[in-house]
Amino acid sequence: MKDIRIAIDGPASSGKSTVAKIIAKNLGYTYLDTGAMYRSATYLALQNGLTEENVPEILDQLSQYPISFGKAADGSPKVYVGDVDITHPIRDNQVTNNVSWVAAIPEVRQELVSQQQRIAQEGGIIMDGRDIGTVVLPDAELKIFMIASVDERAERRYKENIEKGIPADLETLKKEIAERDYKDSHREVSPLRPAEDAITFDTTGVSIDGVVEFIQEKAKKIIDKG
């Protein structure tokens, strides 16, 4: 039995992170939240009043305050910049609405991608994002591209925000998600698209358990072959 690398890509709020975390726990794999890394870079930029005109300064912040992952007492993942816990602040709407321009900076992507590739070398890892199967882990043994309707994704984000006590308006979320889709799929650097050998899975109307089961079955076939 071998440890494989699983890449899950897809648009915002398609359920990638939720599914990836469950599968990582079930398989005993490491979950590397790439979206959280870009959110962390965005958080650092916003905290320091930086824009796309300040690329060297953003890279300097990433060097001074490296991004790392840990676990809370209940096993849930935590995200740090330096020694500061930013697990919750990086889910703020201001960060969400600015992450696209930070993620589109080639030098920022290059720095974070090299960190991700180093971590994934040993296998036994699951990563989700926008370009894992195409750029970060083009040789991953299993690649999944998850899609879902804008309405369903807005509903998911709305429920998540309400549960976390974050104010939310459903129509605003629909508009923001549609705009994010356009930005992510039209950016010059690593646009959102499925890898040629990815399995595209429309999760509209499919339960989280159903999605997890589908991906785990695919993973186990590959693991058993090894």
Swiss-Prot record:
Transmembrane segments: none annotated. Its EC number is 2.7.4.25. The keyword Transferase applies. Its main location: cytoplasm. One of its GO terms (molecular function) is CMP kinase activity. ATP binds at residues 10-18. It is an enzyme of class 2 (transferase). InterPro entries: Cytidylate_kin, Cytidylate_kinase_dom, P-loop_NTPase. It is found in: Cytoplasm. It catalyses: CMP + ATP = CDP + ADP; dCMP + ATP = dCDP + ADP. Pfam families: Cytidylate_kin. GO terms for cellular component: cytosol. One of its GO terms (biological process) is nucleobase-containing small molecule interconversion. The keyword Kinase applies. Keywords: ATP-binding, Cytoplasm, Kinase, Nucleotide-binding, Transferase. PANTHER family: CYTIDYLATE KINASE, CYTIDYLATE KINASE/PANTOATE-BETA-ALANINE LIGASE. Belongs to the cytidylate kinase family. Type 1 subfamily. This is Cytidylate kinase. It comes from Streptococcus thermophilus (strain ATCC BAA-491 / LMD-9).
